[in-house]
Amino acid sequence: MDLRLAGRRALVTGAGKGIGRSIVKALHAAGARVVAVSRTQADLDSLVRECPGVETVCVDLADWEATEQALGGVGPVDLLVNNAAVAFLQPFLEVTKEAYDMSFSVNLRAVIQVSQIVARGLIARGAPGVIVNVSSQASQRGLTNHSVYCSTKGALDTLTKVMAVELGPHKIRVNAVNPTVVMTPMGQAAWSDPQKAKAMLDRIPLGRFAEVENVVDTILFLLSDRSSMTTGSTVPVDGGFLAT
């Protein structure tokens, strides 16, 4: 199925590794013009070697002023994927101010800021656009040691709905994807303990974790005009976890 993404200009945050990097590669392969955002220059440099022509921006999205300076003049953007996120796994009684502040700065505040930049540009141009926020199954379930992470993703789901309501009249669609554990290198390392993995897999009706392409394919569909009537949705990519 041709998603007709060729020629569209897309901005992807958290583009240096994992899901974000794979999103950039898929968009590039589909003919989109991609702006890749990461806080790690070495990751961006290697990404450009893989995908010549990709534009890069190196900035720490936890820094509001630096983000404004780096992205304020990014130019016209048609598609935005807010993928950047951090996760500090701490028991509730041991949550630190530093983990709380960093988590909400990156997982929620940066989404607001970058989305504002892109949406204002779309409205000024009178152009339609699409925003996809990468959330998590953790937004809708209580997971041990994930109190702050779950909170940020729950807030992101609600933000997605509000953005869809307010930006819809401007022909800007906003959706979220909510993956289960994804088999990125980080995911593989975090869930390598068979006992830990079994406890989660037993809660997934399909009995497996998600592959990166499962998430990327869903995001590309939501970015495309094939989903032109879909906005304000949180789309599980979880093998049925949230259905249980």
UniProtKB/Swiss-Prot annotation:
Q: Does the keyword Oxidoreductase apply?
A: yes
Modification sites for N-acetylmethionine: 1
Principal location listed in the UniProt entry: membrane
Which domain of life, per UniProt?
Answer: Eukaryota
- Name the enzyme's class: oxidoreductase
Q: Which GO terms describe its molecular function?
A: carbonyl reductase (NADPH) activity; L-xylulose reductase (NADPH) activity
Q: Where is the active site?
A: 149 (proton acceptor), 153
Residues modified as Phosphoserine: 46
Modification type Omega-N-methylarginine: residues: 21
CC terms in the record's Gene Ontology section: cytoplasmic microtubule; membrane
* A GO BP annotation: xylulose metabolic process
Query: Which UniProt keywords are present, listed alphabetically?
Result: Acetylation, Carbohydrate metabolism, Glucose metabolism, Membrane, Methylation, NADP, Oxidoreductase, Phosphoprotein, Xylose metabolism
The annotated topology with respect to the bilayer is:
Peripheral membrane protein
Q: Does the keyword Cell inner membrane apply?
A: no
Protein's cellular compartments? Membrane
Q: Which residues bind NADP(+)?
A: 11-39
Its job: Catalyzes the NADPH-dependent reduction of several pentoses, tetroses, trioses, alpha-dicarbonyl compounds and L-xylulose. Participates in the uronate cycle of glucose metabolism. May play a role in the water absorption and cellular osmoregulation in the proximal renal tubules by producing xylitol, an osmolyte, thereby preventing osmolytic stress from occurring in the renal tubules.
Give the record's subunit note. Homotetramer.
What protein family does this chain belong to?
A: Belongs to the short-chain dehydrogenases/reductases (SDR) family.
Output this protein's name. L-xylulose reductase
Q: Which organism is it from?
A: Bos taurus (Bovine)
The gene is: DCXR
